[in-house]
Amino acid sequence: MKKGIHPKYEEITATCSCGSVIQVRSTAGHALNLDVCGQCHPFYTGKQRDVATGGRVDRFKKRFNVPGVSK
């Protein structure tokens, strides 16, 4: 590789919201904060987690509930 044209590829720390710390190599140059990792992701753990507790449509239906109107 040519010198001086590539970004520095250095070791950084990626910290997950569950508390696990992972050492990775990256060109980002700063520590990363992760929402999920392999130790807490529902696919890998087999546990379900309710991320969305209702959206805007549910809030609208609750707010403007008209009796007798159905789909």
From Swiss-Prot:
What's one Pfam family here?
Ribosomal_L31
* Name of protein: Large ribosomal subunit protein bL31
Whom does it interact with, and what assembly results?
Answer: Part of the 50S ribosomal subunit.
One GO CC term of this entry? Answer: ribosome
Query: Under the GO molecular function aspect, what terms does this record hold?
Result: metal ion binding; rRNA binding; structural constituent of ribosome
- Function, as annotated: Binds the 23S rRNA.
Q: What's one GO BP annotation on this UniProt entry?
A: translation
> Which cofactor is recorded for it?
Zn(2+)
- What does the similarity note say? Belongs to the bacterial ribosomal protein bL31 family. Type A subfamily.
Q: Which UniProt keywords apply?
A: Metal-binding, Ribonucleoprotein, Ribosomal protein, RNA-binding, rRNA-binding, Zinc
What does the cofactor field's note say? Binds 1 zinc ion per subunit.
Q: Which SUPFAM superfamilies match?
A: L28p-like
The gene name on file is rpmE
Which residues are noted in the entry as Zn(2+)-binding?
A: 16, 18, 37, 40
